[in-house]
Amino acid sequence: MIPDVSQALAWLEKHPQALKGIQRGLERETLRVNADGTLATTGHPEALGSALTHKWITTDFAEALLEFITPVDGDIEHMLTFMRDLHRYTARNMGDERMWPLSMPCYIAEGQDIELAQYGTSNTGRFKTLYREGLKNRYGALMQTISGVHYNFSLPMAFWQAKCGDISGADAKEKISAGYFRVIRNYYRFGWVIPYLFGASPAICSSFLQGKPTSLPFEKTECGMYYLPYATSLRLSDLGYTNKSQSNLGITFNDLYEYVAGLKQAIKTPSEEYAKIGIDKDGKRLQINSNVLQIENELYAPIRPKRVTRSGESPSDALLRGGIEYIEVRSLDINPFSPIGVDEQQVRFLDLFMVWCALADAPEMSSSELACTRVNWNRVILEGRKPGLTLGIGCETAQFPLPQVGKDLFRDLKRVAQTLDSINGGEAYQKVCDELVACFDNPDLTFSARILRSMIDTGIGGTGKAFAEAYRNLLREEPLEILREEDFVAEREASERRQQEMEAADTEPFAVWLEKHA
């Protein structure tokens, strides 16, 4: 089932320096909660400055949904320590609140109680909140409070030059973009390994269903927790953050221009379903527009091609201008065993897997095959640890045992690990391979199995509150290592100044401005 990567691995072993200079970054979302686990109703903590313009700490859907962002970094330890500093400072500046350590929320009874993220009075800030109003009216606020970790990854130019020859200008844009689309296609085919290993949402609180019927064969505990005994990541299931209306958009990952055309089409395609919501009600705007996507960011995807945007530039226009610059991996649940929601083992695994995806052959993928890859993902998401579970290749009928496929993949990853260790020194990547490959013979070692044992004992609420309390105490006591207190104060002041400048620079009323941007 795994493509034959032996030639590509032999090439890599002859060109180890091609992997020197991998760049990465992390984004981590987490809900602010009270000591009893209920959602905080306070505004964004003052010490964190402006959520609109702060470089490192912002908000996602809700005012209580924090998002931490590291700068691009070539050093894993430095990146994780930077992320930990963001958590340390925040833990000291959020009063008695703490950070919810799980992907799935628990103590939220009614979606309407969730305050949307607020970004001030600038047109840009009001637009961001209106986008979230549209998300709430389309999918419900509760679904939008699900948290995850995003891992951003780019290969060094040395890799592309070693692989594609001496490239520059338009040639580099085309070839590097084609290389990243290869990564994306392989990710769709084999990325289910991420929820298998690191999925940490095998259960939900009964309040999350809000009384809606479900076809999933949940087991229920006395405290009202619903779980699937072999599930890995209900966050990635249809219960979680998915958009069924997007499944027939036909967006593919074979070619830059084809992908961008599909994305641009989606933000222009009217939706009958969303038209029923309306645009305005009693003078209040309900969504940006009633198209399938309000804006490009609404496209649900487990992985995205990205380029840093310039001011006023859409993500797709940035891709057209310069091609793909990096990849955003979006399938990581919050790691409940880490105070910062992610750990070194995961980052090193993702490095290995991304390199493997760049090396392995990846035939073009039609939208129908893309849909077929979802079958494997769904199996792993809902019953990944089930004995005897098999997976297929694309739309073909042949089936292969998941543990065997996993071990075959790790045989390749071990060779990538040896190459990365040879240029970085030590055996850190090989150690990660040895630790994780054991999960295929013993699924009890996976994150989902480990957290489910705790949840069955104490419920999701009990588990979440215990971790949240422990991490709050730990982070509040730890000294900062990279950033200093004055760095945070300076960024708070600078972010507030940037927001004020944006608000002062606006000359058009929001309604007029919106007509140009909707």
Curated annotation (Swiss-Prot):
Q: Which UniProt keywords apply?
A: ATP-binding, Glutathione biosynthesis, Ligase, Nucleotide-binding
Enumerate the GO terms in the molecular function aspect. Answer: ATP binding; glutamate-cysteine ligase activity; metal ion binding
To which pathway does this protein belong?
Sulfur metabolism; glutathione biosynthesis; glutathione from L-cysteine and L-glutamate: step 1/2
Tell me the GO BP annotations in alphabetical order.
glutathione biosynthetic process
The EC number of this protein is: 6.3.2.2
Gene Ontology CC: one annotated term: cytosol
Per its record, the protein catalyses:
L-cysteine + L-glutamate + ATP = gamma-L-glutamyl-L-cysteine + ADP + phosphate + H(+)
- The domain of life is Bacteria
Instruction: Return the broad EC class.
Output: ligase
Q: Which Gene3D superfamilies does its entry note?
A: 3.30.590.20
- Family stated for the protein in its record: Belongs to the glutamate--cysteine ligase type 1 family. Type 1 subfamily.
| UniProt xrefs under PANTHER family | GLUTAMATE--CYSTEINE LIGASE (PTHR38761:SF1)
- What name does UniProt use for this protein? Glutamate--cysteine ligase
Protein species of origin: Escherichia coli O157:H7
